[in-house]
Amino acid sequence: FRKDMIMEVLKEKNVKLEELTGIVARGGLLPPLQAGAYRVNDDMVWQLKNKPAMEHASNLGAIIADAIAKPLGIPAFIYDGVTVDEMMPILKITGLKELSRKGIGHNLNTRAAAMKYAREHGKEYKDCKLIVVHLGGGISITLQYGGKVADIINDEDGPFAPERAGGLPSQDLIKYFGQSGMTAKEMLKKMKSRGGLVAHLGVNDSREVEKMIENGDEHAKLIYDAM
């Protein structure tokens, strides 16, 4: 379905497939990676189809790119995938030895924004020390220096967002899960796509919330300010 939509857009824009020399897609939830470009191959496609780190639309990027590129005999790539993990080891440590923090986040967007800032200010990206925030269905906050995403507060740890529940009180979360009757998969779906603004206001579009506030909705203002 998504591939067909892409092909239709290319047709509308008069892009000739035989003139393409390569295709670049968003990287999905692969095992931890260093930042940069990776060529899509059969192993990557299999991993994303069968053993992704978690379910997410970004897993489709490399799969679709490969499906378009192969018949044309051109390479497909991903760049700065979701699982770029260049965090300093000390920052991965938590209060439970069985659990560690992971460098999963909106790396493509935040690294691109950091590089754009560096260019606009006549600096080398590797010489900058920046805090970059991604605002979308989830919110992630990155610390970037030395040319790496050195630390990240991802959409599981930080503020709630239009769709994500964000960081939650751990003891209360455990109690709630035990009493909810939900499976682990159902609970994760609730936290990932039915939390935040969706949970409180029933919408995932901040522009709609802003209209509610303009119309005098005090509860909407409270929730928006909390986010």
Model-predicted segments: where are they?
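Adenine-nucleotide phosphate-binding core of ATP-dependent small-molecule kinases
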Residues: 189-227
